[in-house]
């Protein structure tokens, strides 16, 4: 567990009062662990990793009262910082909780007809681990009535390929949303 704490203290000083209760010095570390890609079947998350780079996709159960309309949403970390973010949530009594955080548009996923996704459970179709990353394919066939959505992510070294597909017999307005933490640079 010490290596996890060392990673935490790369960005945060250990100056809280709680640090006095533990006399162990936990130095910051600059080395970034190389963890393998992993699938958390029970919670419906898949994590692709390549060196320090991480991509997380959420496809699983809705989560009841704590759930968000965010099937197939992703977050991306480049080893230094999060570059595609899942904003999480705020206190339940704050107006932004229902006006922003509980909206599909506040997540890095697909919005259909400017509406929120339905409470639904997605499905993992494939998960492949490679030494230099991996590949995941997940679907959310019930997030929007009549629309079958799937997302394929391929992480290979420092390159991420994101293929989002939405199929329907009817015409819809599709918004592909990425919550970026920085202004993108196009080359």
Q: What does each model-identified segment do?
A:
Residues 1-84:
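Carbohydrate-active enzyme catalytic cores, enriched for enzymes
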Residues 1-9, 90-187:
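CBM-like, beta-strand-rich accessory domains located in the C-terminal region of large
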